[in-house]
Regions:
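Short, surface-exposed acidic
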Residues: 199-200, 239-246, 274-277
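Structured, contiguous alpha/beta core segments that scaffold functional sites
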Residues: 1-223, 228-229, 233-236, 240
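Short, conserved catalytic or adaptor-binding loops enriched in Gly and charged residues
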Residues: 194-196, 270-273
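Activation/maturation switch segments at domain boundaries
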Residues: 5, 15, 223-224, 247-259, ...
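A translation/RNA-centric and nucleic-acid-associated enzymatic feature enriched
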Residues: 261-269
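C-terminal, well-structured catalytic/ligand-binding subdomain of enzymes
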Residues: 232-255
Length: 291
């Protein structure tokens, strides 16, 4: 339901599309003549992440899916298919199919990942978690801001109800004398058709009946103002500036996600011996290519 809210859908898709365009690269830090130098390394793991996962998703769709799950549900998961120490493929797993079995102590924490009844160790999965406190669970925007999103969704449904009635005003019928049950039932049917069928927007009242229009509620009168306030609040929770400034958008909405993905890749895709000098990082110069 959250993705039915236009501002939520726009933010999620814009952020996911932006991240999907940025390639990940592998770098190595070397010391030459006493000076530290960073060089780019050609590596098949980058091709798996950027181009072809060797699963059903291409690199772009793979990154989009991860970012959407990360933002909305707080956790994005991908199975790392290895043969010995070589990564052969990456397999996105929908967050709905991931179940965490906890074995936590206050200090020493451990858990397993269950997918379709099969148990996996954490190192077998790429895990990108939002606002995690235990390394196993993340906090998504839907859970973190459920009250705001509920109001936004109800506002959307309220708008739809206004449109479905063709803008017909609410009101009440005043009668100079008592109405028979048959006349009352007929009037109810006609009134129901007036509000349910946009093609039938005319109702004829007898001489003794008079329609009195009800005044607009405060919700109706402040609808546009309320929508603007809600939309701005939704932009805030995604880190999207209300003026849609591109540079600010990259810094506040995109860079934190890139950092989370980089951290996950360095932890889960690098061998222990590689972690001393190798690291994955996004080439953010690609964001402004063509500007």
């Amino acid at each position: 339901e959250a993705m039915n809210i236009p501002s939520v859908s726009r933010c999620v898709n814009l952020i996911a599309d932006t991240v999907s365009m940025i390639p990940i690269k592998l770098y190595k830090e070397e010391f030459l003549n006493g000076k530290r130098k960073t060089v780019e390394i050609e590596d098949s793991r980058c091709d798996l992440f950027n181009l072809d996962t060797k699963d059903t998703l291409c690199g772009v769709d793979f990154k989009r899916a991860l970012v959407r799950d990360y933002l909305l549900f707080g956790g994005a998961y991908a199975y790392i298919n290895k043969k010995r120490n070589a990564v052969k493929s990456l397999h996105y797993v929908n967050h709905e199919n991931v179940y965490i079995t906890e074995n936590f102590e206050t200090i020493f924490k451990d858990y397993n990942i269950l997918v379709q009844g099969r148990s996996y160790k954490p190192f077998e999965f790429l895990k990108i978690l939002r606002f995690t406190k235990d390394g196993a669970h993340g906090l998504g925007i839907i859970e973190e801001n459920k009250e705001l999103l509920k109001v936004a969704y109800l506002t959307l449904k309220f708008e739809q109800s206004l449109v479905s009635t063709g803008g017909s005003k609410k009101g009440f019928i005043k009668s100079e004398k008592k109405i028979t049950k048959e006349a009352m039932d007929s009037l109810k049917r006609a009134w129901r058709e007036l509000y349910c069928n946009t093609e039938n927007n005319v109702i004829v009242l007898n001489d003794n009946l008079d329609f009195k229009e009800a005044s607009n509620t405060s919700t109706e009168m402040q609808l546009n103002e309320s929508k603007a306030s809600i939309n701005n609040s939704i932009l805030d929770i995604f880190g999207v500036p209300t003026d849609w400034n591109w540079e600010t958008f990259i810094k506040t909405a995109v860079m934190p996600i890139l950092s989370a993905i980089e951290c996950a890749l360095n932890r889960d895709l690098l061998l222990e011996k590689e972690k001393k000098s190798f690291f994955f990082a996004f080439d953010t110069k690609e964001i402004t290519k063509g500007d």
